[in-house]
Curated annotation (Swiss-Prot):
The organism's taxonomic lineage, starting at the top: Eukaryota, Viridiplantae, Streptophyta, Embryophyta, Tracheophyta
Organism of origin: Nicotiana tomentosiformis
UniProt keyword terms in alphabetical order: ATP synthesis, CF(1), Chloroplast, Hydrogen ion transport, Ion transport, Membrane, Plastid, Thylakoid, Transport
GO molecular function (one): proton-transporting ATP synthase activity, rotational mechanism
Cellular compartments per GO CC: chloroplast thylakoid membrane; proton-transporting ATP synthase complex
Designated name of the protein: ATP synthase epsilon chain, chloroplastic
Subunit field text: F-type ATPases have 2 components, CF(1) - the catalytic core - and CF(0) - the membrane proton channel. CF(1) has five subunits: alpha(3), beta(3), gamma(1), delta(1), epsilon(1). CF(0) has three main subunits: a, b and c.
Membrane topology: Peripheral membrane protein
Subcellular location: Plastid, Chloroplast thylakoid membrane
């Protein structure tokens, strides 16, 4: 049995096919979703989406949004998404280093919040290239 996964951004369809299982980063932690999962709607955090397809795990960097799960269909609506295989490792590492430097020199509440969000996005992109597990 499989799940139909759709990952959508405002500009494009990033993924639209059947999968065996996913692990989704939500605002309250990671959740694993298998076929016949209970219906749920949840906020999606900036983080990694892990997709199991043909007994292999693929990764995708998600930049926050919402997900709806029900009837073996998963719809993930996010601000932006990138498949781990599409991310340039060198560019992602440079972006991470720049984001870390910006956090250190940020002044004022707004700059600190924006710098920390940029750092979280940069870390997520690097993690999508080099998954821990």
């Amino acid at each position: 049995m499989t799940l139909n996964l759709s990952v959508l951004t405002p500009n494009r369809i990033v993924w639209d096919s059947e999968v065996e299982e996913i692990v989704l980063s939500t605002n309250s932690g990671q959740i694993g979703i298998l076929p016949n999962h209970a219906p749920i709607a949840t906020a999606v955090d900036i983080g990694i989406l892990r997709i199991r397809l043909n007994d292999q795990w693929l990764t995708m960097a998600l930049m926050g949004g919402f997900a709806r799960i029900g009837n073996n269909e998963i719809t993930v609506l996010v601000n932006d998404a990138e498949k781990g295989s599409d991310i340039d490792p060198q560019e992602a590492q440079q972006t991470l280093e720049l984001a870390e430097a910006n956090v250190k020199k940020a002044e004022g509440r707004r700059q600190k919040i924006e710098a920390n969000l940029a750092l979280q996005r940069a870390r997520t992109r690097v993690e999508a290239i080099n998954p821990i597990s």
